[in-house]
Regions:
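Acidic, His- and aromatic-enriched active-site or binding-groove loops in soluble protein domains
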Residues: 84, 125-128
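Extracellular/oxidizing-compartment recognition motifs
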Residues: 1-111, 119-120, 134-139, 145, ...
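An alpha-helical repeat/solenoid feature that recognizes helix-turn-helix modules
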Residues: 117-123, 130
């Protein structure tokens, strides 16, 4: 069993309090013969830490390998400064954007919502376009927005629309 988390407690155990109702858990039954490869097909997880239980033996650092998944966008911009802190902030911004590109711009890859909030998409759009070729991505997203727009012009809070009002 793999359980994912962004935080750990002081004793090193994973802290999943910020995940709300999200299970962020995968169960895989080993065949037990040589190297095995498995990937979830209908979900993804945003995480910094992973807890592995039920593994036969002592896992090493090479026991698990993560795969980064996101909508394919090409890097078009770059940033470099003489200040290492600014360079690190830029790396964090790029990773944050990529981990939230899953056909729509999502708000968080780790919790239970992973929804395309229009406000979040709006405030990150300029940054995204400075770093990546977002033309095809936003063209598709605008079509999605148009699909949920009411006859009177009203919009939902999220696209695609899941719950709530216009």
């Amino acid at each position: 069993t793999l359980r994912f988390s962004e935080l750990v407690y002081p004793d090193g155990t994973i802290n999943r309090e910020t995940f709300r109702r999200a299970q962020a858990r995968d169960v895989y039954i080993l065949k037990g013969e040589g190297l095995e490869t498995w990937e979830p097909r209908f979900t993804y997880h945003g995480f910094r830490y992973v807890e592995l239980t039920g593994f036969p033996g002592t896992p090493g650092l090479d026991t698990l390998r993560g795969r980064v998944v996101h909508t394919a966008v090409e890097t078009t911009g770059s940033f470099a400064a003489s200040n290492p802190l600014l360079n690190q902030i830029q790396r964090i911004i790029r990773w944050g954007q990529l981990t939230n590109l899953h056909s729509v711009p999502t708000d968080c890859p780790q919790r239970d919502e992973r929804m395309g909030w229009l406000g979040d998409a709006h405030v990150t759009a300029e940054e995204a376009m400075l770093n990546f070729d977002m033309a095809a991505f936003y063209t598709n997203y605008i079509r999605d927005i148009r699909d949920v727009q009411g006859a009177d012009g009203t919009l939902t809070d999220t696209v695609p629309h899941k719950y709530g009002s216009r």
